[in-house]
Amino acid sequence: MNQETAVELNAEQQLIDIKNNLATVKQRINDACKKAGRDPASVRLLPVTKTVSAERLRIAYAAGCHEMGENKIQEAREKSEVLADLPIKWAIIGHLQTNKAKYLARFANEFQALDSLKVAEELDKRLQNEGRAIDVFVQVNSSGEESKFGLPPEAVRDFVQHLPQFSSLRIKGLMTLAIFSSDHDRVRECFVKMRNIQAML
C-alpha cells in the first residue's frame, strides 16, 4: 500500500467516523427534545472547529457539516480562505475586538457574541463597505462570572433597543454560556434568566 492509498483510506475512515458521531449527537438531541416536549427541528447543531485542521473540515463538510463555528477570528479567517471552494457558512462564536471587525465582515455569515455598541457600530460600517449583512446574537453573561464576556441581564433590553440603527446586523436572538458546573440547578438557572429576558424583549 502506497502513502497516497493510505491517506485516502484514512480520509474514508474519518468520513465514516464523523457521520457516525453526527448520528449519535442528533439522536441525543432527539431524545432530549422528546423528554422536554420540544420539536427537534427547533434545535440547530453548530459544530465548533477550534484547532481542527482544514483538511479534516473538508471531510466534515462531506459528512454533512455545512455550518461551522469558530471562536478565534484569525483561525476562522484562515480556514475560510483555505476552504473558499466550499460554500461553508461561518459563525464567529467568540469575543470580537473592534479592530478585528473588518476581517469578520469579509467572510462570516453570523456573529454570536455581540455585547458592545462600539463593536456593533464598527461591524455595521465594515459590512456596509463589503455590501453584506449578517445574523447576530446578543451575548448575555447569565452566570455573572467575571471571566466571561456578555452583557449583564439587566442591560440587555436597553442594548437591544439601540441595535435597529445598524442595518447590516440582523438580530436573531440571545446567546449565553451557562455556568460550567455539575450542579444542574445552577446551570438551569442561567437558561431561566435567558427565557425571562427574551420574554421582556
Role assignments for model-derived ranges:
Residues 2-201:
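Conserved alpha/beta-domain cores
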